[in-house]
Curated annotation (Swiss-Prot):
Outcome of gene disruption: Blocks the desulfurization of DBT to 2-HBP, accumulates an unknown intermediate that is not DBTO2.
May orient the sulfinate group (site feature) positions: 60
Regulation: Inhibited by the end product HBP.
CC annotations in GO: cytoplasm
This protein's name: 2'-hydroxybiphenyl-2-sulfinate desulfinase
Subunit architecture: Monomer.
Keyword set, alphabetical order: Cytoplasm, Hydrolase, Monooxygenase, Oxidoreductase, Plasmid
């Protein structure tokens, strides 16, 4: 580590400017930490992020790294904290997300409403089928990577249940067809061969692959979300029901850090959070730059980012730990509990370490 000089006082050195490296990964979700990294705020804070390689990729689900921070979907951290390794992480912040998502059909499909899905072939991951059918089998005995992939089928499962409700249908009214689903079906060899766990490396050409599945005629509809949904729609596919218009389909993007850092290096954690908050505020006036850096991280077009995350997502990047944000996380936790994907609830208020975010926000009041 090296100390840097405070530009306002050349004769001094700042503890907050000590250079540190943290292992890092992010899911394909909007987040202030990625923004802080790509826009220079972390560099100014003396922090570098070392993105997980594909060969290190299991850490993205196990959190088994002493100096690790992750910004992504809420299901993996809930499983780690509630099922496998309680106390390994602390919750630093939440970014609510409600973007484009739904079950898509070909443009020439006769399906125009949810009720038209009756008797149709719905393509979902094998993980989602296990959840929807209540057939978890050996779920609790699986290794962390495969276990988490099963639980990630929750995204499709919840979306299908909500879609079918619009047509007053149930799961038994459609035919579930197993297909490979991006973000859920990630074989170990695919992970290990990926340069990093960035979306651009791990999930290339998602929309093209999904469009090909629809074109094959093997299924009548399949699920897509996030910027991938925007790119799939650009191929001519259309959602049967735009679930992005329904608040029940909002998710909590969760930011965690190794608990050991909170205990042993609170100053480092504070610098990290300060940089993310500053970047989140900066993003409000730099929407084009923020959109571009997210697009590059995921390997998608800037237009797809706006569709997948919401046109004004740049205004909402500052992490939160307020009641509504925690309630959003609790809603996902309840789905996991109801479907036996989680055995005991995580006490979210105890998991959270709000002092860092509170300190950062107070700097701007």
């Amino acid at each position: 580590m090296t100390s840097r000089v405070d530009p306002a006082n050349p004769g001094s050195e700042l503890d907050s400017a000590i250079r540190d490296t943290l292992t890092y990964s992010n899911c394909p979700v909007p987040n202030a930490l990625l923004t802080a990294s790509e826009s220079g705020f972390l560099d100014a804070a003396g922090i570098e992020l070392d993105v997980l390689s594909g060969q290190q990729g299991t850490v993205h689900f196990t959190y088994d790294q002493p100096a690790y921070t992750r910004f992504g979907g809420e299901i993996p951290p809930l499983l780690s904290e509630g099922l496998r390794a309680p106390g390994r992480t602390r919750l630093l912040g939440i970014t609510p997300l409600l973007g484009r998502q739904g079950f898509f059909v070909r443009d020439d499909s006769p399906i125009t409403a949810a009720a038209d899905l009756a008797g149709r072939r719905i393509g979902v991951s094998a993980s989602a089928i296990r959840i929807l059918r209540g057939q978890l089998g050996d779920y609790l005995e699986l290794d962390p990577w495969r276990q988490t992939l099963v639980a990630l089928g929750s995204w499709e499962a919840r979306a299908l249940l909500h879609t079918l409700e619009h047509g007053e249908l149930g799961v038994d009214d459609v035919e579930l067809v197993p297909i490979s689903s991006p973000g859920v079906d990630v074989p170990a060899e695919q992970l290990e061969e990926s340069a990093t766990v960035k979306g651009a490396d791990l999930f290339p050409d998602v929309a093209r692959g999904q469009a090909a599945v629809l074109a094959s005629g093997d299924v009548d509809a399949l699920y897509s979300w996030l910027p991938w949904a925007g790119e799939l729609q650009a191929t001519g596919a259309r959602p049967v029901v735009d679930l992005g218009l329904d608040e029940r389909n909002a998710y909590a993007s969760v930011w965690t850090v190794s608990s050991g850092l909170v205990r042993q290096r609170p100053g480092l954690v504070q610098r990290l959070v300060d940089a993310a908050v500053d970047a989140g505020l900066w993003a409000r006036d730099h929407s084009d730059a923020v959109t571009s850096l997210h697009a590059a991280n995921l390997g998608v077009s800037t237009g797809a980012v706006g569709q997948g995350f919401g046109a004004d997502f740049q205004q909402r990047l500052v992490p939160r730990l307020d009641h509504d944000a925690l309630a959003l996380l609790e809603r996902t936790q309840q789905f996991l509990l109801t479907n036996n994907l989680l055995q005991e609830p995580v006490a979210l208020d105890q998991w959270a370490a709000p002092e860092f975010l509170n300190n950062s926000l107070n700097r701007h009041r």
